[in-house]
């Protein structure tokens, strides 16, 4: 019987130590949103509730187009803000890379028309979008 108590105590101790290590490491998978020097850009636009799903679909199509056609690599994720506005968050490697991406967007007729279609689907214009940037430090 003592042998089973010893094995039980040993197993309990082992599991406790492992679970503590596992729980302590759960934050290691999370990385900072941006590294110093990178730039985060947010887009926010009002959109009626009934138009949100279509607008998000259009944003996803625009992001797919960017990934395939933009000569400047950057990451973008679409979504709905807590206040119900639609938009996206982009991550650029630097201020210079962001400016090059913006220049490509303006020069690319298809991208520009896709952005206008997103705005139009919500009954707004592209000028109505709030675009803000954050320089990560």
Where in this protein do the model-derived segments appear?
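Non-heme di-metal
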Residues: 114-115
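Bacterial N-terminal signal peptides
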Residues: 9-19
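Short S/T/G/P-rich N-terminal loop/turn motif that feeds into the first structured element of a domain
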Residues: 20-110, 119-137
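Bacterial N-terminal signal peptides that target proteins for export
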Residues: 1-11
């Amino acid at each position: 019987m003592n042998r089973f108590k010893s094995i039980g105590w040993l197993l309990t101790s082992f599991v406790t130590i492992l679970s503590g290590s596992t729980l302590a490491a759960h934050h290691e998978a999370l990385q900072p949103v941006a590294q110093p020097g990178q730039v985060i850009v947010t887009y926010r636009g009002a959109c009626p509730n009934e138009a949100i799903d279509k607008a998000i679909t259009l944003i996803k199509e625009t992001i797919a187009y960017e990934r395939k056609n933009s000569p400047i690599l950057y990451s973008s994720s679409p979504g709905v803000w807590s206040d119900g506005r639609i938009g996206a968050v982009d991550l650029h490697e630097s201020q210079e890379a962001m400016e090059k991406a913006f220049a490509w967007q303006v020069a690319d007729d298809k991208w520009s028309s896709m952005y206008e279609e997103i705005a139009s689907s919500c009954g707004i214009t592209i000028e109505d979008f709030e675009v803000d940037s954050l320089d990560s430090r």
